[in-house]
Design a protein with these regions (language model features):
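Non-catalytic accessory segments flanking enzyme active sites
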Residues: 58, 163-165, 187-228, 243, ...
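Residue-level detector of Asp-centered blade-edge/turn motifs that repeat once per structural unit
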Residues: 61-62, 111-112, 157-158, 249-250, ...
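Hydrophobic beta-strand positions that form the internal "hydrophobic ladder"
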Residues: 63-66, 113-117, 162-163, 254, ...
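A flexible loop/linker signature enriched in serine peptidases of the S9 family
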Residues: 70-83, 98-104, 117-131, 139, ...
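Short loop/turn segments that connect beta-strands within beta-propeller blades
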Residues: 88-92, 134-138, 218-222, 275-279, ...
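Short substrate-entry loop that stabilizes the transition state in hydrolases
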Residues: 463-468, 473-513
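Active-site-proximal cap/loop segments of hydrolase catalytic domains
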Residues: 491, 496-497, 504-708
Length: 708
């Protein structure tokens, strides 16, 4: 007989099975555990917001210390405050370095190990500015006073200068001129915005006519000097960050990413290099019509790594790890035959290899890539890792580890074995008093008879001798595969604590399962994920501990689209939740990225394909009670989608509720709004799918083991 029992961390195996004998024995154990469980608190949305959130860490040049921004949220104030903490990578207690009310972010360690640069908005700052602070403490000192604000600081090797990015008007030559234009636009009673070229928006904001460029400044302050401005190749206007540029180890050259498209409808990001002191910029990737991005110099300065896609206009195309040899100007592809996407890359201090945080079959694993070639090698197994940094001998690798049961936690990782040692305990005390359900990874047969991986989170008091309701969560993207990681917006532990078996399935199109899997839905958005969702429900129905009459489903973004799609097709769910979901694919394509060239042609060239994939075409079949949620500031999936869906359901007499947030975007990010979001979900689900254990489950037949 083969019995697999979920543990508090992710495991892979067969679904929860138990014989009658095991159940009887478990009752005795359960009575002992009950007293412990009674002392614990449920994992609620309010409890989740009490947890501290860690951002990307930076590591000291000798590898002995890490610095990380830690955000603590105040529910009454409805906001968070981020402070910098110093954490030893071997032994010792963390030490708080900053304590500003406004919040500090983006720490960067100086090459000499003496200073930490960071971004903050303090005192009379109108925009975020660059600050430095000594590692041994003291007062932080402002370095810039740029009216357009700064982001993504990086050090020059002499530890006397810093680079940063900001968005400027190239035709204005001085900072006072830029400050004057900002004031003029802010004070103007005329509020019209005008565009002659796409794109005009990004996620939750309108884009203006400024351009993103790299500047440098001395640590003592003074006038920042433009680096990329005169070359005429701006960085990404929509989402520039630290991966947009890098500085060579000798400080003489900069590598950066710029969109070479001049139409606004056919983006092509390329990697450029140019002298820091000025001169022409050279395009290293002009021969590739798809995107190249994330340049990263090796510590010895010989090599430049970057990532390359080959399918134009497909953001989920796997990124190849490319190595450019600066002396010979030759480029090599390290991962052409590897069916995963290179991501989250950092160099080993010896320049012989890189480490990456790779989306891999439902988990983010750390992989090692040898510069000499060979198959990339996974060095971690369970849990998900990201935000890597490396330094010192060994090397010392730090990063954030997380799972469905562990919020991002600072750890050190042994490169040879992948063993991780926890360095921070910011959330240990809070988590010790919270009940979290067991987590399991299962595989079932989905569309086309192909295996689909699925994460299942059980209620903390789950026993397989009773029938339980299901809440199936539908992830977004659609290519953002669900990994074993902590979710702040759709936290499965919160749903499980309400009394629902909660699951995420990595349907066709999900990242981390190979290029063919990701690309299988790019022309037809609907069919395969729909089939995978129905097959997931059928898999659960076959389990003796699931009540087939108490099943629900819901998701956001593409997950909201999939929920809306289910409305018009046969499905077994008693209620659905659609957050920021696409309802009318015509208006969605036209408003979101309609100006961008379509990979499979434009919507006016193939109405039948759009009709097959648009939920609104099946409105005559809508009968399922539905909770609809949307934020006014959402420009990724504009709010009209949810307004149209709600009105359609109301017209048809289908029980429905519209929850509208005037101050939220594609996500619900403010603490009080988030708690209300969870409360509303809970109330709605309880109305149609009663939580908690129900009638006794039929005893399962003994399972015949097929394990070796």
């Amino acid at each position: 007989m083969s019995i697999t029992v979920p543990t508090s961390r992710a495991v892979k195996g067969k679904p929860y099975r138990a014989t009658l004998a095991l159940l009887l024995a478990g009752l005795a154990v359960a009575s002992v555990a009950a007293s412990v469980a009674d002392a614990a608190e449920p994992f609620t949305a309010e409890a989740m917001w009490k947890l501290k959130r860690l951002a990307d860490p930076a590591i000291s040049p000798d590898g002995r210390m890490a610095v990380v921004a830690v955000t603590t949220y105040d529910m009454d104030q409805n906001k968070g405050d981020a402070d910098l903490w110093l954490v030893p990578t071997k032994s010792g207690k963390p030490r708080q370095l900053t304590s500003a009310v406004s919040g500090d972010s983006s720490p960067a360690w100086s090459p000499d190990g003496e200073l930490i640069a960071f971004i903050s908005k303090r005192n009379d700052d109108k925009e975020p500015q660059l600050y430095v602070i000594a590692v041994d403490g003291g007062e932080a000192r402002r370095v810039t006073n740029v009216p357009t604000g700064v982001a993504a600081p990086k050090w020059f090797p002499d530890s006397r200068r810093l680079a940063f990015i900001t968005q400027v008007w190239p035709e204005l030559k001085t900072w006072p001129e830029m400050a004057a234009r900002l004031r003029e636009r802010a004070d103007s009673k005329m509020t019209a915005r005008v565009w002659d070229k796409a794109p005009f928006s990004y996620w939750d904001r309108f884009l203006d006519d400024r351009k993103t460029h790299v500047y440098s400044v001395g640590i003592e302050g003074g006038e920042p000097k433009a680096i990329t401005l005169e070359a005429g190749h701006p960085l990404d206007a929509a989402e520039p960050d630290a991966s947009s540029y890098d500085i060579s180890p000798d400080g003489t050259e900069i590598a950066f990413v710029s969109d070479t498209d001049t139409t606004g409808t056919d983006p092509n990001f390329d990697v450029f290099v140019m002298p820091v002191d000025g001169g022409a910029a050279r395009n290293l990737t002009a021969d590739n019509p798809a995107n190249d991005f994330a340049p990263l110099y090796s510590p010895d300065g010989r090599l430049l790594a970057f990532r390359k896609q080959v399918i134009k206009g497909f953001y989920a195309d796997r990124a190849r790890l490319m190595i450019y040899e600066r002396r010979s100007q030759a480029t090599r592809n390290l991962t052409e035959d590897w069916d995963r996407s290179a991501d989250g890359l950092v160099w080993s201090p010896d320049s012989h290899s890189l480490f990456g945080a790779i989306d891999d079959a439902g988990t983010r694993r750390v992989y090692r890539f040898d510069v000499g070639g060979g198959t990339p090698r996974a060095i971690t197994g369970d849990h998900s890792f990201g935000s890597l940094a490396a330094a010192g001998s060994g090397p010392v690798i730090i990063g954030l580890r997380q799972s469905f049961s562990e919020p991002p936690t600072l750890v050190s990782i042994i490169a040879r074995t992948g063993a991780a040692t926890k360095l921070s305990d910011f959330n240990d005390a809070a988590l010790a008093n919270l009940t979290q359900g067991k987590v399991e990874s299962v595989t079932y047969k989905g569309a086309n008879g192909e295996d689909v991986q699925m994460w299942v989170v059980y209620p903390p008091n789950f026993t397989p001798d009773r029938k339980w309701p299901l809440h199936l969560l539908l992830h977004g993207g659609p290519h953002n595969g669900m990994t074993d990681g902590y979710q702040w917006r759709w936290n499965a532990q919160v749903f499980a604590n309400w009394g629902y078996v909660t699951a995420w399935h990595n349907f066709h199109g999900s990242s981390g399962f190979g290029q063919a899997w990701a690309d299988s839905i790019t022309k037809e958005w609907a069919e395969l994920p729909y089939q995978d969702t129905i097959k997931a429900a059928e898999w659960f129905t076959a389990q003796p501990w699931i009540d087939a009459n108490r099943m629900s489903a819901g998701g956001g973004s593409y997950g909201g689209y999939l929920a809306t799609l289910l409305l018009g097709r046969p499905h077994p769910f008693k209620t659905l939740v659609a957050h920021a979901g696409v309802y009318d694919l015509y208006s969605q394509v036209a408003t979101d990225d309609g100006a961008t060239k379509g990979r499979y042609g434009e919507y006016w060239q193939d109405f039948e394909r759009i009709n097959r994939n648009s939920p609104h075409m099946n409105a005559a079949n809508f009968n399922t009670p539905t909770l609809i949620i949307h934020g006014q500031l959402d420009m990724r999936v504009p709010v009209n989608n949810s307004l149209e869906l709600f009105n359609t359901l109301q017209n048809r007499g289908v029980p429905s509720r519209l929850v509208y947030f005037p101050d939220e975007n594609h996500w619900v990010l403010k603490p009080q709004n988030s708690v209300f979001w969870y409360q509303t979900n809970r109330q709605w689900l309880q109305q149609y799918v009663k939580p908690g254990p129900g009638e006794a489950a039929a005893a399962p037949a003994p399972a015949v083991s097929t394990q070796q």
